[in-house]
Amino acid sequence: MSTINLDNKTILVTGAAGFIGSNLVKRIYQEAPSATVIGIDNMNAYYDVALKEFRLNELAKYPTFTFVKGNIADKTLITELFEKYKPSVVVNLAAQAGVRYSITNPDAYVESNLVGFFNILEACRHCESLEHLVYASSSSVYGSNKKVPYSTDDKVDNPVSLYAATKKSNELMAHAYSKLYNIPSTGLRFFTVYGPAGRPDMAYFGFTNKLVKGETIKIFNYGNCKRDFTYVDDIVEGVVRVMKKAPDKKNGEDGLPIPPYAVYNIGNQNPENLLDFVQILSEELVRAKVLPEDYDFEAHKELVPMQPGDVPVTYADTSALERDFGYKPSTDLRTGLRNFAEWYAEFYK
């Protein structure tokens, strides 16, 4: 692997107002205070834009952070950004997120996750300063796979949602560009990311909003779902470590590039039962005074069948990440949900 020192480098982060993107920008500045970070985000209204503005306001304190409001599906804009800033490292986190939303709004996924990612790849191809492209894939690429834990060595050609299909497509497109144009690229399959200032469409956040309003929360597959919940700080720690080590460029016996390409899982290697997760969340919401001590959780829970596009379990095998980067996520669920509950109490008071 080629080591990259992020100090004094120009780094482009797409989806910079997003949950992972904004936390990544903060982590980059901890790692490399003299870096220049260009953030792009279309600030779409898929969920409350006030959350995105809150995250951006937290990034305003960094003098070398520049925010560009725009869409990665806008090829002219992306081309101009790359020509102007000449990034050394690109982290593509911009994407239309959410499995269930992809069933009713497929066009948004094609625009952002396919056309947008293609524009990033094309810009990387023509960017002489580029040392590493890192991009978000997803645990959803494992689809209906039965073998757990999920390993990056497993076949992943059974997506159960369009979202998953677009993420697998990103890996294939990146592989082709790595092979054709010798672009070092690393895809990261994130597992159920959660934490403060997250996405309201994620279970922990959506459940909290509903419980606060006295509404009933629906627990899918009658509670027989397990998720490898991964705390956002652990995710961005993994991303920064990966950014600093790019797959090596080398040629094969045929004289053509061996694709400088890699894919890793970033997950907690600890699937939690959804009912246990709801129990811990409820305890932490009471502790943070988001909900009263006498709140009747049983009266606000409804067990319902599995949703289309969902899978019963996600479980990350992170042995490759540990081997190559000496890192594995370690934040336990209670600690992470406590941090979320305390943030929620403050943000919505």
Where are these regions (language model features)?
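A glycine/serine/threonine-rich, flexible loop-to-helix segment
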Residues: 148-149, 200-208
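Amphipathic coiled-coil/heptad-repeat helices and related helical stalk/stem segments
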Residues: 52, 74, 203-204, 235
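Short coil/turn segments at alpha/beta junctions that flank glycine-rich nucleotide-binding fingerprints
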Residues: 180-184, 200-201, 246
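N-terminal Rossmann-like NAD(P)+-binding domain of SDR-like oxidoreductases, especially those catalyzing
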Residues: 1-193, 272, 279-280, 313, ...
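Proline-centered turn/helix-capping motifs that create local helix->coil transitions or kinks
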Residues: 134, 143-147, 182, 198, ...
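The catalytic Tyr-centered alpha-helix of NAD(P)H-dependent dehydrogenases
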Residues: 159-166, 190, 196, 200-204, ...
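C-terminal substrate-binding subdomain of Rossmann-fold SDR/epimerase-dehydratase oxidoreductases
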Residues: 27, 31, 211-349
